[in-house]
Amino acid sequence: MLVAPDQPFPSSVELVLRRYALLVDARGASALGFEAAVAAMAPATKAAITADLKCFLAWCKSRRPVATAVPAEPETLVHYLHWLAKGSDTRPPAKPATLARRIASVARIHRILGFGEKEPLPTQAGMVRDTLKGIRRKKRERQRQAAPLRFGEAMQNGQAPPEGVTVKALLASCGTDIIGLRDAALISLAYDAGLRVSELVAATVADLRQVGDGSGRLEITHSKTDQLGEGALAWLSGDTMARLSAWLLVSGLSEGPVFRRINVLTGPSDAAGQQIVRHYIGDRPLTRQGVVAILRRRVFEAIDLGHVDLEPGMEGDTVRALSAHSFRVGLTQDLFAAGEDGAGIALALRWSSPTTALRYARELAVGNNAAARVLGRLRDGGGQTARSPPANRDIL
């Protein structure tokens, strides 16, 4: 037993440890310290550690002889990394970013259980670090980032507006029916506030506030980098507030989640021969998968309506490169294009550091650096200015 007996519901982390108790030495663990460490984790962090721990413990159990998981031997971790990187018929090879996360979770569990205070953790051994570096070098894989969804305007003099799928194109694909109003409000809010998908689906009516100039504020009560729940405020444009108001008015929502599933039921035709269609709005917030489905549906509709100009055959690749995170990446690039600095963008969009924001502006910077500006004029005709990279064709 790791956690105090009076705790009514063991955490998912503890349940996994209990299941593989014979592989884990928890004698030096503090029940109070374990409970505090798990309680301090954000839900997404707890879910990731639970999955990573379950994977590692199950692998240790399958070894012959069975390998001790905690404390682990560095050699055990090296074999584990190679097993993950190799893949199998039922499991694709793990990417370098996944391997690093798996090892980080193993290290965290060791610390929670009292290891690493008097001697280095096994995850810090040179052979483990070298194995990670070797796999990363062998695969030569840069971590894939979501393709950006930029607004669709030229953000700086001399720059051409982004091409391809843009926020403006998606908004133009939304009709005035109840589903179109919801989708337009969702797209507009996600872009304006640069929301993570977890922040988007967690938004409630009570979190929205309009101010005198027509703009608004969104209170973000929890986020990935705000595990203490201190909260943050995001600015919303007047256009976004108008779209939110239209959606809330037609939906009749006055409290609870802003964005929910809409069920469509069709019935027999009325006296005029028109088919009866009823919309039922659910009580629960949209899921991450629901947001992605809405985004992809709107992309295809924007293409069909002629709001997006793509090369033939690029539709599938374009849609697959986009995710709910694309709004956040696109806004980051638009702010850089407008001349804002990394520190200000990181603060406004709740990035963990300016370095993270700079990474998402990497491709934009290449299209507007000194070489692009000078050679763009020399090679593309005198006086022409280098164009910013397409918003949708930068598929990473």
What are the language-model segments listed below?
Residues 161-197:
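Basic, Lys/Arg- and aromatic-enriched nucleic-acid-binding interface segment
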Residues 253-254, 292-347, 375:
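Short, basic (Lys/Arg/His-rich) helix/loop patches that form interaction surfaces
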